[in-house]
């Protein structure tokens, strides 16, 4: 994916949510306490950083974008520290001071780059009249291009349904970083960004990618969302939308020091990029670059454009759509993997009733290279090739089953009688067919050979064919 970094100074984001102070006590650990089997930490450094929704604002500010933060705090020293640090980062804020509740503090004790314990100083903001907060949102929302709702389930967003309705009325995109199992609260939002644990707490354990994608689509439909972005720590991110194939934003394996605040970084960079006019896909790409940077840092951190560019230039982070793709998207994806030196294998067929012969053949085809494309005859093409009674399964059904195979990277349909045009357009390194073909008889073979590619004929499992299966069923009936 080719991404030009936006001019973030033109971005504007309104953040509403649970603000908190992340406090860190650092010190060496050399011995065990005599009164209990616990380590003694000699604290020699204390660091305070804005956390929660405030960390989202810090990440936006680190890009040079304009933002405003709305939320609830107590009337205490922590609130003063939080406001001071936000001022130093040129972040505008409007907090409602609640005398009956303290400002939320998350205290982490750190030693030798390890977190030993976390102590939470907080009280749920219940019985707090959020009318003032709603009025502030109504006042400031027209001045910003994107709205972020950072929900840590601390009570600041008890009026979240009304805020989302207001944003929809004003036609402002809403990004929600959710918490808890009541996703119905976020109905009508543009995008939800749960981490994998939060997502599975709603839909149950996802044993494989296909289950995860299907359940994500159900969430999108049930709650009238435009998209769902699932963050997966060092495994990157998965973007699901209503009508397009899922996108996987993966990171190379690296040492992960801390994931504290990584979700805030994703939401912050994502919102700033969307506000600048980037597409959702490119905004997610940039957010994943930033997350790749912050998980290597200690404590609550932010990322900047320079770090993101360095990661992109070193090819640490890539984005690859998988599964069923259109020709244009597939062509772009092939270009990405080719730049990394990967070899492309392509085959084609009807694949009407998938059987063990198909699976064995596709497995052997994949071994020739790094990525396997399966081009599938359309229903009309199949009828012209096989007769009026075929296909048994529709094009959509056949492609769905093929995309579920782990050896298949991409599935693409073609509507002509032969795949020659598609083969020429995609230019695979290996063109493969199974059966008794001669290389010169394989459609598209000459073009592949002329470009320096390879054409191979693989053995097909004897006796295995869709036609044989259909005839056997007819005989039994």
Curated annotation (Swiss-Prot):
One of its GO terms (biological process) is ADP-L-glycero-beta-D-manno-heptose biosynthetic process. It is an enzyme of class 2 (transferase). Residues 1-319 are annotated as: Ribokinase. Keywords: ATP-binding, Carbohydrate metabolism, Kinase, Multifunctional enzyme, Nucleotide-binding, Nucleotidyltransferase, Transferase. The active site is at residue 264. Signal peptide: none annotated. It catalyses: D-glycero-beta-D-manno-heptose 7-phosphate + ATP = D-glycero-beta-D-manno-heptose 1,7-bisphosphate + ADP + H(+); D-glycero-beta-D-manno-heptose 1-phosphate + ATP + H(+) = ADP-D-glycero-beta-D-manno-heptose + diphosphate. Catalyzes the ADP transfer from ATP to D-glycero-beta-D-manno-heptose 1-phosphate, yielding ADP-D-glycero-beta-D-manno-heptose. Homodimer. In the N-terminal section; belongs to the carbohydrate kinase PfkB family. In the C-terminal section; belongs to the cytidylyltransferase family. This is Bifunctional protein HldE. The gene is hldE.
């Amino acid at each position: 994916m080719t991404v030009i970094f936006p001019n973030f100074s033109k971005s504007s984001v309104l953040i509403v949510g649970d603000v908190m102070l992340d406090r860190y006590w650092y010190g060496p650990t050399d011995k065990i306490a005599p009164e209990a089997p616990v380590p003694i930490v000699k604290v020699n450094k204390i660091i305070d950083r804005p956390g929660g929704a405030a960390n989202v604002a810090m990440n936006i500010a680190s890009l040079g974008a304009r933002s405003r933060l709305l939320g609830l705090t107590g009337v205490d020293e922590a609130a003063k520290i939080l406001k001071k640090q936000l001022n130093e980062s040129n972040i505008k804020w409007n907090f409602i001071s609640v005398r009956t509740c303290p400002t939320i503090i998350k205290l982490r004790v750190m030693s030798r780059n390890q977190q030993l314990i976390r102590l939470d100083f907080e009280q749920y903001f219940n019985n707090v009249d959020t009318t003032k907060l709603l009025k502030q949102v109504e006042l400031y929302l027209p001045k910003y291009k994107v709205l972020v709702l950072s929900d840590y389930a601390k009570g600041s967003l008890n009026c979240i349904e009304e805020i989302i309705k207001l944003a929809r009325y004003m036609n402002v995109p809403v990004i929600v970083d959710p918490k808890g199992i009541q996703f119905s609260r976020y109905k009508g939002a543009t995008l939800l960004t749960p981490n994998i644990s939060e997502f599975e707490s709603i839909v149950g354990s996802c044993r494989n990618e296909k289950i995860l994608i299907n359940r994500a689509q159900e969430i999108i439909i049930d709650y009238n969302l435009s998209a769902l972005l699932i963050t997966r720590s060092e495994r990157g991110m998965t973007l699901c939308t209503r009508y397009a194939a899922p996108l996987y934003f993966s990171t190379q394996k690296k040492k992960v020091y801390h994931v504290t605040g990584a979700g805030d970084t994703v939401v912050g960079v994502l919102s700033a990029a969307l506000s600048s006019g980037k597409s959702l896909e490119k905004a997610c790409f940039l957010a994943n670059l930033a997350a790749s940077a912050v998980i290597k840092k200690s404590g609550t951190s932010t990322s900047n454009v320079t770090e993101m560019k360095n990661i992109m230039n070193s090819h640490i982070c890539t984005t690859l759509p998988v599964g069923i793709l259109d020709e244009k998207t597939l062509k772009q994806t092939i270009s990405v993997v080719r730049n990394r030196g990967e070899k492309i294998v392509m085959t084609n067929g009807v694949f009407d009733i998938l059987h063990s012969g198909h699976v064995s053949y596709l497995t052997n085809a994949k071994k020739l290279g790094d990525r396997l494309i399966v081009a599938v005859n359309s229903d009309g093409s199949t009828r012209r090739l096989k007769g009026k009674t075929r296909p048994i399964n529709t094009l959509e059904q056949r492609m769905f089953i093929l995309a579920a195979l782990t050896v298949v990277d991409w599935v693409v349909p073609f509507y002509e009688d032969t795949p020659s045009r598609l083969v020429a357009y995609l230019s695979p390194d290996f063109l493969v067919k199974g059966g008794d073909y001669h290389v010169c008889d394989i459609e598209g073979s000459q073009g592949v050979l002329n470009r320096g590619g390879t054409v191979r004929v693989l053995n097909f499992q004897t006796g295995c064919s869709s036609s044989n299966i259909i005839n056997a069923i007819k005989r039994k009936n």
